[in-house]
Amino acid sequence: MTEKSISPSRDIGVVVPDNWTGYELDVFSLPNHYCEDLECVFIPHGVIVDRTERIAHDIMRDIGDNHITVLCVLKGGYRFCTDLVEHIKNLSRNSERFISMRVDFIRLKCYRNDQCMDEMQIIGGEDLAKLSGKNVLIVEDIINTGRTMTALLNQLEKYKPKMVKVASLLVKRSASSNQYRPDYTGFEIPNKFVVGYALDYNEYFRDLHHICIINEKGKNKYKV
């Protein structure tokens, strides 16, 4: 990824252009059983790690000196959340602005195959009452249309948290977007179905270190 192909922005993260074709599979280490199911490596693991560290810096700048309840959206958000929390801890450990964190979990079901369903299922919503009066940082893997996150935020508002911030590794450019933007964005990407780094296609591909584009053969192979 060069400066000309991908541009950084504090407001919308690193913008991956529509014409970005990614990297050839054979220049990276990938599980053999997935190689025929992938189109390209879209965002390499090292780039994800560096961008996550920068987001941690921004969070420290904005909400340091607070106790934060980190609400990790499972399953796709767990790896981004783990890495982000670790970066924040490392920064906090060597800073005058200390952030103490407690991590909680929620699951949102909104996909079948590669299609976003109309109804969002919240699993673990009965625990949301614990967030009353708390500073909450929601950590998500990807914002697609924005409707899922908007629905979750509306649900959280019923419990009157003190503050809510959202960090999403990816935000997808989509014609059906409601224009919702998280407070912290890793990468803004084209409207492509991505897998890897804990993002899945029917529970497959979570174990990939890189973010990749799944091909049609892969979609058909793992379709339910």
Swiss-Prot record:
Alphabetized Pfam families for the sequence: Pribosyltran (PF00156)
Positions of GMP binding: E140, D141, I142, I143, N144, T145, G146, R147, T148, K172, F193, V194, D200
Keyword annotations: Magnesium, Metal-binding, Nucleotide-binding
Binding of Mg(2+), residues: E140, D141, D200
Keyword Signal belongs to the record: no
One GO biological process term: purine ribonucleoside salvage
GO molecular function annotations of the record: hypoxanthine phosphoribosyltransferase activity; metal ion binding; nucleotide binding
Cystine residue pairs: none
Transmembrane segment boundaries: none
Record GO cellular component, one term: cytosol
Family from the record: Belongs to the purine/pyrimidine phosphoribosyltransferase family.
Name of this protein: Phosphoribosyltransferase domain-containing protein 1
Naturally occurring in which organism (per UniProt): Xenopus laevis (African clawed frog)
